[in-house]
Amino acid sequence: MSSRFLRTAVARATQQRSMYENPYINRFKARSKVSEDFHKKTTGITGLFVNEHPHRALTVVYGRILRALEQIPRDAAYRKYTEAVVKQRLALVQAENDIKKLEEKIGMGQIEEVIEQAEYELETTRAIVDSKAWEPLVESAPKGQWSWPV
């Protein structure tokens, strides 16, 4: 009985893939399909797929960023400035229904790029919360470390 499982495992491990078979394309093929009536078929950027529901995606990510920022003290510079930008963009997302106009108002490229930037910002916010970057240093900085030029 165990030999049957062993044979299938060995067969899978030694199975050769043709040079024309791209696992990346097979994995993401479903994400690359866009409905016929959508205004664009591709972003023109390799690996960045068209998002047919950007308002929903941005609302979710911006909400997560704002919830993560609540864990940082109000007087921390990162929280103040990031919260201002995220709230401004969230207001734009909620106010503007047209995707092309929203891209113009945000001014950071295609809406898919804005979604990707928001996801990176969420990762950054979570990393700052984990590291507690707003707390004072464990030991004081050496004299002259922050003076420039030397």
UniProtKB/Swiss-Prot annotation:
Pfam families: ETC_C1_NDUFA5. Coiled coil: none annotated. GO terms for biological process: mitochondrial electron transport, NADH to ubiquinone; respiratory electron transport chain. It is a peripheral membrane protein. The keyword Electron transport applies. Signal peptide: none annotated. GO terms for cellular component: mitochondrial inner membrane; respiratory chain complex I. The keyword Cytoplasm does not apply. Keywords: Electron transport, Membrane, Mitochondrion, Mitochondrion inner membrane, Respiratory chain, Transport. It is found in: Mitochondrion inner membrane. Accessory subunit of the mitochondrial membrane respiratory chain NADH dehydrogenase (Complex I), that is believed not to be involved in catalysis. Complex I functions in the transfer of electrons from NADH to the respiratory chain. The immediate electron acceptor for the enzyme is believed to be ubiquinone. Complex I is composed of 45 different subunits. Belongs to the complex I NDUFA5 subunit family. This is Probable NADH dehydrogenase [ubiquinone] 1 alpha subcomplex subunit 5. It comes from Caenorhabditis elegans. The lineage of its organism: Eukaryota, Metazoa, Ecdysozoa, Nematoda, Chromadorea.
